[in-house]
Amino acid sequence: MCARVTLTIDDIDEIAGMLDAELSPEDARRYKRRYNVAPSDTHWMLEYGADRRVLVPAKWGYVPTSPPGRARKPLINVRGEQVGSGHGFREAFASRRCAVVTDGFFEWNQRREPFWYHRPDGGLVLLGGLFQGAADAEREPRFTVLTTRPNKLISAIHDRMPVIVPAARIDDWLTAPPADAAALIAPAPEDTLIATPVSRRVNKVANDDAACLAPPEADAQGSLF
């Protein structure tokens, strides 16, 4: 399960430039660096609209269609193996794919020790996702993150990992026919990410500051005061 992400780059315009994406001034004013993004938070996704990439804020949690009177909980992750054949996601996978814009994500080992998975060069980590338009009472679309089987790095502590879309294939992910996009639902190459142990401060969703990425030793030092 992918349930926490980061986006710590200072400037949203810099991010939009990296992605060659359109960004409205109104949306740009809402940006702030995030060190512990959790489900139900508003975050940033890349979609394809009006013949170009667009960077927009969206809420984390995709609400599946359900019979009248039977509300379903928002889904933060969907297994990538399901989207091509499952009736609940086939249409979304065909026409509403997105990339969730991050520079890393967290996973925990059995001792609840957190690790931050990120690129060695500090670059963007684009997670394959699906989105749905804003409901009548909401101002933002919603998204979910697709998962796949883990690569060797992540399999040491978890049996799933998010789908990571290579920057060079982002247009294929956003616009290609479903069969072509499905080929990108696969474990990331081993050299894509590194794992950095970080502070248990990130274990609490209320904590969202640079101290979340401090080394574990900072926890022990903090306990002395």
Where are the regions that the model predicts?
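Short linear sequence motif anchored by a di-proline
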Residues: 1-225
